[in-house]
């Protein structure tokens, strides 16, 4: 959007384009974001709820238009999006959601009939939604950016951003990029040392791709009940693949993460008769304390730094919403959606409970985890195991690989100093406070940390 507006743009990525979270989603292009609209009407009022609904419906239309106009081959298909309930206890919530969505002019209806191969008590149906292959789509857009004075720099990690009359992005290579405006779209803003730390919760989500004999569904589904399961299908040249995502938890809260994959496999087998597991992966996203993303100027004092974060696992349409809002602001235009999404908003009644809960949690990990008793030495480590130990009264993250090599690094996250914990399935050190993740040798996998864990 900025390039089309005549601006020169540079995109920098610590890894490769579409290698991270955006390339590993279930890729539903929909304004149906689970049970959200009844909540928005109650907490934000009619006008703001209407903004959320319209913005995401408009994002769906915009993406459909881009894919058609640019002839992007990304397996785009039209589909309906359903929230379903297997329990009678959740039906009232579904009916409330339908009423709210219809009041906001969304294409919603209640039904008791779906193509799911198991009985349900009811479902919310949004028609005229879509699904696609996110990586194919993102790489096509990236090709549109590069050229005519615009650039993409991959494998370039930003360390910090300074702002005066212009902004300077400082990178890990020592190079610096000067720009009038900078958008920090690193999930958790890498430059934040204050407001976002208290208002964003990192969540991990798990996904599997399993083989099914026949394609069980044409549309997209998500369960109303906890644990939430998100469902869609994908066809290869030779197989029908059922994608199931769910079993979410706060980052760094679970050590034996392998159990979450097994629960997804059990669900796919019991509900769909799934066979072999072809793919498995995990992803991460952030949730704001009031469930609405933060999109706009980084802080009230920032003139040229912007951010987009807190998508609550609904980043496909919200990324396009963010692009529209930020393109308008940077070009000096009014954005009709900004008043809802602005990071400067204050909704004390809406978010107070989650705000307190989040910050008690962070404080617990910042203080209590430092004082825990831990065994000393690495003698008890088995191959493939990671464990927190004490060395000279310091918390150390120790890992033994399959060849018996031991890696020891500081257990103190380089972002804001919380203690990391071991993730057995991904073999990583994860920070529960703000979502940073590190490889066994301390290398940064996921921001907001930009520096590795110190070697010990």
Region spans (language model):
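C-terminal catalytic lobe of FAD-dependent flavoproteins
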Residues: 225-226, 250-355, 409
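Glycine-rich active-site loop/strand segments that organize a redox cofactor
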Residues: 24-55
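Flavin-dependent oxidoreductases
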Residues: 160-234, 373-379
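Helical element adjacent to the flavin cofactor pocket in flavoenzyme catalytic cores
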Residues: 92-93, 99-104, 123-181
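Rieske [2Fe-2S] iron-sulfur-binding domain
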Residues: 208, 388-456
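Flavin (FAD/FMN) cofactor-binding and adjacent substrate-gating region
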Residues: 35-41, 65-140
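A non-catalytic, amphipathic alpha-helix used as a structural packing/dimerization or gating element
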Residues: 51-65, 96, 263, 267
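Glycine-rich FAD pyrophosphate-binding loop
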Residues: 3-24
